Amino acid sequence: MAGNSGFDFTTEKKNLKYPDFWAVDSLFMKCFPQRIIHGTEPAHDNDILLSESFARKYWKHPQDAIGSLLTQKTPSGFYIPNPIQLRVSGIMADAPENSSFQHEGYYLNNSENGDYHNKENWMYIANTHVHLVLKEGIRFNDFSQHLLSSLHEMEILKNVKFSIIPLFQKHFEFAAEESFSYS
């Protein structure tokens, strides 16, 4: 899961001011299913699922956004050789208040073209979040120590700070019923 570039997007004479869109892979949707209220889940790279509140800001009815092409806008003085183009595939319900996933959209990016051994490609890691499900019997503290020591052995990552937060602590603030549900 990685944050967007910090640029505006445009569509149909609308300027979408610095949207909080995140690139995710198909496993994100399986681990963190979103409640789809219009359209479908992203099926192809650069398909995007917008939050209902974001769609309402720019379209009269949220479902009117479906099929729209959102193009990354290059600010004056910047050059982007391949601006991101996203196609709206669906509208998701806004996340509950106790969720740490309060983003305005998730777009599919299953690209396997990245050369992760090239240190220049790691410059974007500061805005990247990786979510893991540990196998049964793996202790969080043991896994954390092993992962952190392994990451810091890589020369290209010596100056990068990592933190590992258990999802149940990061993602949920349990209410009295101690459960989480979209319904």
Locations of the language-model features?
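His/Cys-centered metal/cofactor-coordination and adjacent catalytic loops
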Residues: D47
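Glycine-rich loop motifs involved in handling phospho/adenylate chemistry
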Residues: E41-H44
